[in-house]
Amino acid sequence: MHPLPEYPRPSMRRDSYVNLNGPWDYAITQSSEFPAKWDGAILVPYSPEAKASGVGRTLQPGQWLHYHRTFTPPAGEGGRVLLHFGAVDYACAVEVNGRLAGGHRGGYWPFTLDITDLLRPQGRNTLWVAAQDPTGTGTQARGKQTLRPGGMFYPAQSGIWQTVWLERVPENYIDTLTVTPDYDARTVTVKVHTSKPGGAVNLWAVVRAGGVTIAEDWGSDEADRDGEVTLNIAEEHFFPWSPDSPFLYDLTVGTTQGEEEGFDTVHSYFALRKWECKEDAKGIRRFFLNGRPILLNGLLDQGYWPDGLYTPPSDAAVEHELHTVRELGFNLLRKHAKIEPERWYYHCDKLGIIVWQDMVNGGGAYPMWYVTYLTNALQPLMRRAPDGKLLWGFLGRGSAHSREEYARELADTVAALGQHPCIGCWVPFNEGWGQFDARKATETLRALDPSRPVDEASGWFDRGGGDVHSIHNYFYPLRIRPNMRTVALSEYGGIAWPMPGHEPPRKTYGYGTARSRAELTEHYCDLQRKTVLPQLKKGLSALVYTQLTDVEDEVNGLFTYDRTAIKPDAAAVRAVNEALEAEFEKAVKA
């Protein structure tokens, strides 16, 4: 049985699929050369630092992590064979049968290699991956990974950490699929690029709702040969997506290019929904979803697991966690300093969970005493800190190379996740970590994706741009004032309690403490009812409590690290969320 056997890319699904997760040979060496011997077996897709990998070793900067296995290509004849990696942290080279297939840099983004011409006509094939990860010694996106974990920073992880798979495709296959719904026009535009660009592409598309075909275009018009079609959604089949009704349309797309080129078919889905930031009936700026003001009430989600670090134990575990989030009455998760495997976003799409997506922080080393601790203590002053290259250097972006690297990572993130309806806001920077020229980042995001709000600088070093006035507040009285932007309390709370019966932290970390379940419940409910709720009528429109789960030493989650227990009383949490929603509805009424 393969770990994580589910098809890993729900937004572009094919029937041909061979999962390569499972035991591989591994070795950690000081050289990029093929190892003379193997150190043992590693369970892919778990990083060697993770218990679930069976290895339990930390890859150091400068070392090489080697993987090796044999494989049989997908059944069938002809066409091309593609090798997909969900993510490899950070840089890797890939060889098939001793010949270079390609490589990749970037620890959070998928990549694909066409290995057809490297395959043996008969027998088994060999696959070798050599990876390196500089962690904190580089400038690449790394999130909260560190070689010296503690407090709010967690163990580094390296190498393959998402599913590896093969598929057989036609000679001229669909390389990229872009699906652009238009809520106001009641349409969806489908565009493909194929592996052999430049020629005519005869495209067809079928939209289904609840298994019933509601729109189709079979590529009969000359206009369809440019690889793009637009389909109309009739009024009787118009079902907007929202947390209360997360309706997804099924989409099947194909190309018809004759026997030589083959016929490619992929399956996808989409939703119709519209985000706006505008004034409510009382002139206060709010988030609007599908023309209605909405309270975004959620949790900070860091995406770590006790045995797998970045990689979950199973798809069912992910789905269960997200179901519980909805059952508790939350409609938002802020995905913090990490990009998840695509199936995580797919489950959010299905369950109606809105996601605020952080760009994964990187850059050179920055002094945490200044960037986080001093800045937190002097928030009003730091919000006015002058922008420019001097500050960028303090924040780890002194080099032009690092800034260019961030621009590529930002574009890759939007390309990888932009088609998921659950994504409700982009967050280019958090608390100044690797921040530079935030206004430009916002402009870039709006050019890449004009359909979503931007929280330009979550926490501090605010430049006044974007759509959100984003506040982190753990220690001070909360005073919300009307703003030209929509106001979000994008981090707060963080009450720590190490729940008995679960693995204790090395050192308890949080923002305030509780001594029992009853005390944690009381502190949480008092914070929400007495501090947060009165601010809703003053303009507070989004809440992100810290946090969803315990993570390593940070025991301030609503769930335990292993997700087996909810720490505060679940009924009390639901009741508080209902009270917040009721107060918000009163606040936005004319």
Spell out what each predicted region is.
Residues 1-347, 351-355, 409, 424-425, ...:
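Secreted/periplasmic carbohydrate-active enzymes, especially glycoside hydrolases
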Residues 323, 332-577, 583-589:
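Substrate-binding/catalytic cleft of secreted carbohydrate-active enzymes
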